């Protein structure tokens, strides 16, 4: 180390020796060379005074001692010598000392049914499921695994479910700059319903299974066939297709296979020479048409569309139209399973796995939604007891609800409120409007659209004002993928006003009692009321 420093200084001295012999002599004195001349004998220094000569010698001695002191200090030992010589140094350093979080963030805006919105700054690799969970926690909603993000393309009237494993930031990257597109958050009860009741979504006249599945087919067997990577059932039926670049529609017989969607050029023949490829699915998504008749001139309101992922114009759309809602649901569900079947099944079975934005603790729901974790309790006696009989538990729950409302009415009556029918109806109206399933003044068509958007599975319902009969109500519900409407008739008994669905055989003092009764009992309805349609703010 000392030698290299001296060599460097000697080299520097030699480089400047041609121009300045004085610099060479001073450098030798500073380095303590034995052959250095006396400063008095060096040309150019003979004019220095003795005082100046002594000062120069002292400065040179101090410089010499300082250099020697620096050179003699031992180097600081390296506490991790193996990291300096290891070929894996960079890998270990990156693992042991990670850099600051470099995940890119992006702002996305999510809308609700009432058009309120919330802007979120999220990592670019966050999934749609994580975005739903963040909004659920922020708004203190109960997570029942039905909350869903929807991609809404306003300018062409299309909408689709953003699957739980998809990245919303990628969805936004496919939008055009000037397009008025939105992400909506709402419930979709039909999102994974086909895993529970596959035959409900795939009617026998539209599905052809392999020969080995002839005979009785259990839901488990049907599900295994749809999730199989080697075979896939053939979906077939008539559809209306919009001709490319034209406004006209043409009816043809279509076949859905693993290789794509085909139509027959000769009736219902499925011979290879008669089949022509209509679209494949590797670079496209399936959308529901919201206003097919108005925007695209569709012959029926049950339209859907195959749209490429890239931003494009209406010419890139593959517009289709079914004869009924059940047929459209079958086609759309089959295409979803064909594209992401096993991934959708994993999303359904393990909704809280694979989070990218937060850990499992911060993303856990604030309230448990598992019915198995709740027990019915009876506190009427001196000691509380668990009610084991389910029938008794339901009856106790109904009785407590009725008693609560009765006490509330008595409190209102004691304060001089409702003896008059008009005052009583005003109180009931205030109670009804506080319920999430009550939608007040919406039309029949709007009620149908709302139920379809939130998944037309059996038992999805809402209550609204009747447009044809003032001061009465209508129960709108879905069953068999059809929307049905039931008039809630007001009846009077002993001067009191009641509500009924069965001509007075079962009477209720308000709509809350009516809804709770039919949530527990089928009665005159085709099925029990299971899921209510609500417009939640984000």
Curated annotation (Swiss-Prot):
Its main location: cytoplasm. The keyword Phosphoprotein applies. Pfam families: BPS, PH, RA_2, SH2. Interacts with the cytoplasmic domain of the autophosphorylated insulin receptor, through the SH2 domain. Interacts with GRB14 (via BPS domain); this interaction protects the tyrosines in the activation loop on INSR from dephosphorylation. Binds to the ankyrin repeat region of TNKS2 via its N-terminus. Interacts with activated NRAS. Interacts (via SH2 domain) with TEK/TIE2 (tyrosine phosphorylated). The gene is Grb14. It is found in: Cytoplasm; Endosome membrane. Residues 232-340 form the PH domain. Signal peptide: none annotated. GO terms for cellular component: endosome membrane; plasma membrane. It is a peripheral membrane protein. It comes from Mus musculus. Belongs to the GRB7/10/14 family. The modification N-acetylthreonine is found at residue 2. This is Growth factor receptor-bound protein 14.
């Amino acid at each position: 180390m000392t030698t290299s420093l001296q060599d460097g200084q000697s080299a520097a001295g030699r480089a400047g020796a041609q121009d300045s012999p004085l610099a060479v002599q001073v450098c030798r004195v500073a380095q303590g060379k034995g052959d250095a001349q006396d400063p008095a004998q060096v040309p150019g220094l003979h004019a220095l005074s003795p005082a100046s000569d002594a000062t120069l010698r002292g400065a040179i001695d101090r410089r010499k001692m300082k250099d020697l002191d620096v050179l003699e200090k031992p180097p600081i030992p390296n506490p991790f010598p193996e990291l300096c010589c290891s070929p894996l140094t960079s890998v270990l350093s990156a693992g042991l000392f990670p850099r600051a979080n470099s995940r890119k963030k992006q702002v996305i805006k999510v809308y609700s049914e009432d058009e309120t919105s919330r802007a979120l700054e999220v990592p670019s690799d966050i999934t749609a499921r994580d975005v739903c969970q963040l909004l659920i926690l922020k708004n203190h909603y109960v997570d029942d695994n039905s909350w869903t993000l929807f991609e809404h393309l306003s300018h062409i009237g299309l909408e689709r479910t953003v699957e739980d494993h998809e990245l919303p930031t990628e969805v936004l990257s496919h939008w055009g700059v000037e397009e008025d597109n939105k992400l909506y958050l709402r419930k979709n009860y039909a999102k994974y319903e086909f895993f529970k009741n596959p035959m409900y979504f795939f009617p026998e006249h539209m599905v052809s299974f392999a020969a080995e599945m002839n005979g009785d087919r259990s839901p488990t067997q049907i599900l295994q066939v749809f999730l199989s990577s080697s075979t896939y059932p053939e979906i077939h039926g008539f559809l209306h297709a919009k001709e490319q670049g034209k406004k006209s529609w043409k009816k043809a017989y279509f076949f859905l296979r693993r290789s794509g969607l085909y139509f027959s050029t000769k009736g219902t023949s499925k011979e290879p020479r008669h089949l022509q490829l209509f679209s494949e699915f590797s670079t496209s998504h399936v959308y529901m048409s919201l206003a097919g008749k108005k925007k695209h001139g569709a012959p029926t309101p049950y339209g859907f569309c195959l749209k490429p992922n890239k931003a494009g114009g209406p010419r890139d759309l593959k517009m289709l139209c079914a004869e009924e809602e059940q047929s459209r649901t079958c086609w759309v569900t089959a295409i979803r399973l064909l594209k992401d079947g096993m991934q959708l099944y994993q999303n359904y079975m393990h909704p809280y796995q694979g989070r990218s934005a937060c850990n499992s603790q911060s993303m856990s729901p604030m309230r448990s939604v598992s019915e198995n974790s709740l027990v019915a309790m009876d506190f009427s006696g001196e000691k509380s007891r668990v009610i084991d009989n389910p029938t008794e538990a339901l009856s106790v729950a109904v009785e407590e609800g009725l008693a609560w409302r009765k006490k509330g009415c008595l409190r209102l009556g004691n304060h001089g409120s409702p003896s008059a029918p008009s005052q009583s109806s005003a109180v009931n109206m205030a109670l009804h409007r506080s319920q999430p399933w009550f939608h007040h003044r919406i039309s029949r068509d709007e009620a149908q659209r709302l139920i379809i958007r939130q998944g037309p599975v059996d038992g999805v319902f809402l209550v609204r004002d009747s447009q044809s009969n003032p001061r009465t109500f209508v129960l709108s519900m879905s069953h068999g993928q059809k929307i049905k409407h039931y008039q809630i008739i007001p009846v009077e008994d002993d001067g009191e006003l009641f509500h009924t669905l069965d001509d007075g055989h079962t009477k209720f003092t308000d709509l809350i009692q009516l809804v709770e009764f039919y949530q527990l009992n089928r009665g005159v309805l085709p099925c029990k009321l299971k899921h209510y349609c609500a417009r939640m703010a984000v």
